[in-house]
From Swiss-Prot:
Its EC number is 3.1.-.-, 3.6.4.-. HAMAP family: MutS2. SUPFAM superfamilies: DNA repair protein MutS, domain III, P-loop containing nucleoside triphosphate hydrolases, SMR domain-like. The keyword RNA-binding applies. NCBIfam families: mutS2. Disulfide bonds: none annotated. The gene is mutS2. Residues 711-786 form the Smr domain. Belongs to the DNA mismatch repair MutS family. MutS2 subfamily. One of its GO terms (biological process) is rescue of stalled ribosome. This is Endonuclease MutS2. It comes from Bacillus thuringiensis (strain Al Hakam). Keywords: ATP-binding, DNA-binding, Endonuclease, Hydrolase, Nuclease, Nucleotide-binding, RNA-binding, rRNA-binding. One of its GO terms (molecular function) is ATP hydrolysis activity. It holds the Pfam family MutS_V.
């Protein structure tokens, strides 16, 4: 990729923003060396990797990359036998902990059902060195000091040091508190010089204490003397300190040797966490600029939906739809300067560079982008004072270089093509240059203010005109790209708005040819037609959304009605069964009582009287039971029943659908939300529903309207939404729905991606797709069930 192209498209500014999201110097080093790739497979993998990291951020908010530092030089020094300092060893331990923590973090997410195949592969390369990590942290404290517990010998030596220091201080403090101290000492303090304890003695009393003079004040009036009485104690203290230093060096060498043994593994782990830091920096940057993963194709076309420039404030930038490579291979954007043409040009270029670097791009979901082997850009005014080149010459030098290298795998961006020279000659050159590049099969976006190029798009196949809309009322560009509409200067309208008289403007119009006036009027009508078409589309879209809302409300009311009906049915059935049971118990009780009376010969009761008594009791049972007995006795299905048939269950007088035969005489029947076993003798065949042709919108078998044909997840949290999807698909399968719709909205695409990831692994899902224009488009996934 040409360095000039990266510069004029401000690729390095994107990298500067990306650097802000790295967690370590390792990640920053990766970003600094980032360049766009031209390998299709590598780009697809990089995009998928960034997408997985973005999924982690959506679910967890962050990634545990703290504590990781660039320890590569220290590890290499350990390999060649150099002793590492405590802080260097501590950095190694912290980095080992960070890599181990990152590995556990990703693996825990995978264990909980989150699909992260690429990140899982990355962390699988991390080898835990927990034992070495603990050895270092057990020997070195957080402040970088070797702790007493590093070895028993070190603990003993430091005990000796503390004891010696205590004895020395005690003796010296006794001296400073004596009655003569005020006279002979400059100050009643104990201090240290040359690592030995001393007291400040006035010059004239140097002989009183004896001992060794280690230092004197600037004036020479005070001597820092080590009194003779503590010389031996100070000597013992120094010997202990030498032993301490030797033991510390032994411990550090031991730890350094342990690092050297595992050096290759440590360096491998560092490379993995460096890549992870780099990957998550991309994901955090995508979140910052509200970017999404583009679909990468190898067919040399792009479809950028609502594309934005990443370096412009998203609150003020106007997003545009930019298509190139299918219906046309060249876009010529015409119109006046300061209209936003260059921003559109740079947006195309930087989006391609970002995508080929594995970065998500600031576009809507389902945007597509292709891979270019070369990207050429001639943008901006780059006069060369050293080479005495004018603006035109500078551009032409660059264009000559482009024409030497451009081919069918190239994207070429021309800004103000042919500018800086005679307009007529410049326009002719622009047309010739465009023809040359187009004939090579390159994809081209060019801007110009020459009116001669307005007809270019109409006279060439695979070329289309475009313009950036200009509001003559506010005298400012709207920055909205109008594909298919060439630009116009608006000079007369702007002049009139600024106060130029109609007489002068009319005279100016007379100087323009009739053909030019006709072209300008035609362009004005095209702009107006496009605005009207867009307004009509927006109105139609609003009506469609209103219709969808009414449809959902109707579905909700139907569900509530059926639920209430089924609830009442269940309640009535339960009450009926309770009454039947109560009547039966009462009858049995009376009969038992009569039998006992007869046995006791307390009453002359015959069997036929018992039967009559039971009949009278049964006559008191609810009408429901009597109806059931009559129906069971007098009816039998004459039609051979099959699963899917619609029947009437005589017990309840309700229609149901046969699910499966559970025995020779019983079927499992679905009645509303109820599923129950019913005998064949207690049902009446109605019909066999015809197999209707499957439509784009899901239909329902039988009459089960209790499960909605669509599930609305908009506004739901990610975890709640996934739980609702799982339950909804189970309910839809029980209701034998062939097809349902899941509304997730467009938004950032997180919910959509989560839904579709879940659908891929659901055993009950046959296929799924996005909704058509009338079904909700990208905001809806239509699911076909098995």
């Amino acid at each position: 990729m040409l360095e000039r192209t990266l510069r004029v498209l401000e690729y390095n500014k994107v990298k500067e923003q990306l650097l802000e999201h790295t967690a370590s110097s390792l990640g920053r080093d990766k970003v600094k060396h980032l360049v766009p790739s031209t390998d299709f497979e590598e780009i697809v993998e990089m995009q998928d990797t960034t997408d997985e990291a973005a999924k982690v951020i959506r679910l967890k908010g962050s990634a545990p990359l703290g504590g990781i530092t660039d320890i590569r030089s220290n590890v290499k020094r350990a390999k060649i036998g150099s002793m590492l300092s405590p802080n260097e060893l501590l950095d190694i331990a912290n980095t080992m902990y960070g890599s181990r923590n990152m590995k556990r973090f990703i693996e825990d997410m995978v264990d909980n059902g989150v699909e992260l195949p690429i990140l899982e592969t990355h962390v699988a390369q991390i080898v835990s060195l927990y034992d070495l990590e603990k050895k270092i942290t057990n020997c070195i404290g957080d402040g970088g000091e070797v702790v007493d517990s590093a070895s028993d010998k070190l603990r003993g030596i430091r005990t000796q040091i503390r004891t010696a220091e205590s004895r020395i201080r005690e003796k010296l403090e006794n001296m400073t508190r004596s009655s003569n101290a005020q006279k002979m000492l400059s100050d009643s303090i104990v201090t240290i010089r040359n690592e030995r304890y001393v007291i400040p003695v006035k010059q004239e009393y140097r002989g009183v204490y004896g001992g060794i003079v280690h230092d004197q004040s600037a004036s020479g009036q005070t001597l820092f003397i080590e009194p003779q009485v503590i010389v031996e104690l100070n000597n013992a203290l120094q010997e202990a300190r030498v032993k301490e230093k030797q033991e510390i060096e032994r411990i550090l060498l031991m730890l350094t040797e342990e690092v050297a043994v595992e050096a290759d593994i440590v360096l491998s782990n560092v490379e993995v966490v460096a890549n992870l830091d780099f990957i998550f920096a991309k994901a955090f940057y995508a979140k910052r600029i509200k970017a999404t993963k583009p679909i990468v194709n190898n067919e040399r076309y792009m479809d950028l939906r609502q594309a934005r420039h990443p370096l412009i404030d998203p609150e003020i930038i106007v997003p545009n739809n930019i298509m190139l490579g299918k219906d046309f291979t060249t876009i010529v954007i015409t119109g006046p300067n300061t209209g936003g043409k260059t921003v559109t040009l740079k947006t195309v270029g930087i989006c391609v560079l970002m995508a080929q670097s594995g970065l998500h791009i600031p576009v809507m979901d389902e945007s597509e982008i292709c891979v270019f082997k070369n990207i050429f850009a001639d943008i901006g005014d780059e006069q060369s004072i050293e080479q005495s080149l004018s603006t035109f010459s500078s551009h032409m030098v660059n264009i000559v270089d482009i024409l030497e290298k451009a081919d069918f795998e190239s994207l070429v961006l021309f800004d103000e093509l042919g500018a800086g020279t005679d307009p007529q000659e410049g326009a002719a050159l622009a047309i010739s240059i465009l023809d040359e590049v187009c004939n090579r099969g390159a994809r081209v976006v060019a801007t110009t203010h020459y009116p001669e190029l307005k007809a270019y798009g109409y006279n060439r196949e695979q070329v289309i005109n475009a313009s950036v809309e200009f509001d003559v009322n506010t005298l400012s560009p709207t920055y909205k790209l109008l594909i298919g509409v060439p630009g116009r200067s608006n000079a007369f309208e702007i002049s009139k708005r600024l106060g130029l008289s109609d007489r002068v403007i009319d005279q100016a119009r007379n100087h323009i040819s009739t053909d030019t006036n006709k072209i300008e009027n035609m362009i004005a009508k095209l702009e107006e037609s496009q605005k009207n078409a867009e307004r009509d589309w927006n109105e139609a879209e609003a009506l469609r959304k209103q219709s969808e809302k009414l449809h959902r409300e109707l579905q909700r009311q139907i569900i509530e009605f059926n639920e209430e009906r089924d609830e009442r049915l269940l309640k009535a059935q339960k009450e009926g069964e309770e009454k039947v049971e109560a009547a039966k118990k009462e009858a049995e009780g009376i009969i038992q009582e009569l039998r006992q009376l007869r046995k006791a010969q307390l009453a002359n009761v015959k069997d036929h009287e018992l039967i009559e008594a039971k009949s009278r009791l049964e006559g008191a049972a609810p009408e429901l039971v009597k109806k059931q007995k009559v129906n069971v006795k007098n009816t039998a299905p004459k039609q051979q029943l099959r699963a899917g048939d619609e029947v009437k269950v005589l017990t309840f007088g309700q229609k149901g659908q046969l699910l499966e035969k559970v025995s020779d005489t019983e079927w499992s029947v679905q009645i509303g939300i109820l599923k129950m076993k019913v005998k064949e003798s207690n049902m009446e065949y109605i019909n066999t529903p015809k197999q209707t042709e499957k439509k784009a919108v899901a239909t329902v078998k039988g009459r089960d309207y209790h499960v909605s044909l669509e599930l609305d997840l908009r506004g739901e949290r990610f975890e709640n939404a996934m739980a609702r999807v799982e339950k909804y698909l189970d309910d839809a399968q029980l209701a034998s729905y062939p097809r349902v719709s899941i509304i997730h909205g467009k938004g950032t695409g997180a919910l959509r991606q989560g839904v579709q990831d879940y659908l891929k692994k659901h055993r009950g899902v046959k296929t799924f797709r996005y909704g058509d224009m009338g079904e909700g488009g990208l905001g809806v996934t239509v699911v076909e069930l098995k």
